[in-house]
Amino acid sequence: MSNILRRGRLEAAQDEEILRYTSSMEADRWIFDADIAVDLAHTVMLKEQGIINREDCSKILSGLLKIREEGMEKLDFSYEDIHISLESRLIDMVGEDVGGRMHSGRSRNDEVATCIRLVLREELTGLLEEIHELRQALLTLAEKHTETLMPGFTHMQHAQPTTLAHHLCAHEAALGRDFDRIQDAYSRVNLCPLGAAAFASTGFNLNRKRTQELLGFDGLLENSMDAVSTRDFLIECASGFTNLMINLSRMAEELVIWSSSEFNFIELDDMYASTSSIMPQKKNPDTAELMRGKTGVAVGALMSLITICKGLPLSYNRDLQEATPNLWRSVETVRASVRIMEGMIKTMKVRPEVLVAQSVTGFTTATELADTFVRETGIPFRTAHQIVGMLAREMEKPTLKKIDSVAEIVLGESLSSRGLKEKMVKEALNPFSNVEIRKIAGGPAPEEMRNYLSKRQTELELNRQEIATLKDITDSAFENLLATVNEYRQA
């Protein structure tokens, strides 16, 4: 049959190159199920509002369910998008006098905006679950290592002793903020634009609240012009994905470094490694390296979305067709990265003996030694900093005698004369004592870390319940939609 969209206004058919250039059919695979759901909800509402009769409603609903069963491959890919292709298939099945009524009071503009939001909210829910599992993996590993000493780093130089638990929880805290950002974005994604039509709404007596309810949205995007033209929710989500990928790339970088011969802190499971085509001894951390590289997918998608949306006049413009494929690439990459990082964390072998041995190299206890001088002798911290800095030049383990000789140069008197004892020096140079004394909120002291881990586990359980609630709401909505569809089909 002729193209149902172009046959009235346009005489010339598009050649293959133009069709390929303008078609979104391949990208629309993401929204096939969502488009069926939107059509079902819209048709139910049309019948309830008396815009179509019961018999036509039944035929349209049955046809839509048949199309869903057949799958997208049965659609005609010569159309420019899934919406027209799906409607054309429906008309083939039930005739134009019936199928041609489905689009009453609707535009592709509000239709596609609704489809995108349906798919995106499902992706967000899945991503929230996956972030939750990764955070749980980090906390579970941290609980085993609250007393496992390791060097902390600044500028990639040994800085102060800490624990593996403290380090892992730093990553979990960042992921917790990623979780919060994405969960917050969900509230702006889960709003319904359906009923906005092209941009000026419609003269048909539609019930927008009814389609919102049938599709499980939390509310309406009320201004019809804003409803069809806004893609700020895509930019917001892509920004959240980028932030998340940047945090994952930092974790991946550490896995690469820590698994090197020079560090030897961990060994990655063979599943996440590859070897060389020429050097048979190699075990390369390729998966973690690729995760660093794939951060560019998320960053690139965000930049593309910003560029596409920048400067667009109201309301709908076809530029927006190019926006969603960028988002789908980003969310696919990000979700896979989170799942794979969870697997790497769960299966990697930690080498506590190496971590402990490295915790004192590079004079990591220098800060505590300076702090001890301040607490025990009353000298200013900046003076203590100078004394310890001069001791660090010697590259030897400081003794009270050596400390006194340097203090004589700086202060004109020894620190032992001000009350410093050899026992105090030894305590300050003990890496475990360094960690144990740091028991203020957020510090690495084992007792503080155990309290912190308990609080984080409580927060994770609350997050799990919040995810379950989101899923229950949307699952219940679709169950009700299908129940209503089946009722109207039988009628």
From Swiss-Prot:
Major site of localization recorded for this protein: cytoplasm
Presence of the UniProt keyword Cytoplasm in the record: yes
InterPro entries the UniProt entry points to: Arg_succ_lyase_C (IPR029419), Argininosuccinate_lyase (IPR009049), Fumarase/histidase_N (IPR024083), Fumarate_lyase_fam (IPR000362), Fumarate_lyase_N (IPR022761), L-Aspartase-like (IPR008948)
Subcellular location: Cytoplasm
A GO cellular component entry from the record: cytosol
EC number: 4.3.2.1
Alphabetized UniProt keyword annotations: Amino-acid biosynthesis, Arginine biosynthesis, Cytoplasm, Lyase
Catalytic activity: 2-(N(omega)-L-arginino)succinate = fumarate + L-arginine
Lyase in keyword set: yes
Any one GO biological process: arginine biosynthetic process via ornithine
Pathway assigned to this chain's UniProt record: Amino-acid biosynthesis; L-arginine biosynthesis; L-arginine from L-ornithine and carbamoyl phosphate: step 3/3
Domain of life, per lineage: Archaea
GO molecular function: argininosuccinate lyase activity
Family from the record: Belongs to the lyase 1 family. Argininosuccinate lyase subfamily.
Protein name: Argininosuccinate lyase
Organism the protein comes from: Methanosarcina barkeri (strain Fusaro / DSM 804)
